[in-house]
Amino acid sequence: MTDVVLTHMHMDHVGGLLVEGVKERLRPDLRIHVAAAEIKFWESPDFSRTSMPTGFPDAIRSTAKRFREEYQSQLRLFDDEQQVAPGVVVRRTGGHTPGHSVVRVASGGDRLTFAGDAVFA
């Protein structure tokens, strides 16, 4: 595996990368693609308009900080759109989170769009 695309940074999407021992099993040159807006949001998220259980916002911030610290050198941030590989493009759409992205895959005449958790926007 050479690339990972994160549609957003909720724990159910980044958590597997934070499991003890996982990073050591990944390629040192692994590229992790994520929208710059997503990183910016999780550095200082505004949860003032949401109702979350006590302590949950702090847990989210802590996870995002740990992810950024552990994978900083492997992050490939993009503003609007980035080609990950031939036929694979990631595009920031916002919605579910400020930097939520979709992945478009094209092969021959076939097309696929993976929308992450956009249904929960």
Regions found by a protein language model. Give the residues of each.
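Active-site metal-binding motif and surrounding structural segment of the metallo-beta-lactamase
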Residues: M1-H33
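Conserved beta-strand elements of the Class I
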Residues: T2-V5, V89, T113
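Active-site glycine- and acidic-residue-rich loops that bind
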Residues: H10-G15, V89-V102
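A short secondary-structure junction signal
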Residues: G16-V19, E43-F47, S101-V103
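A generic local structural motif
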Residues: L18-G21, S62-T63, R76-F78, H100-S101
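Metallo-beta-lactamase
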Residues: L26-R92
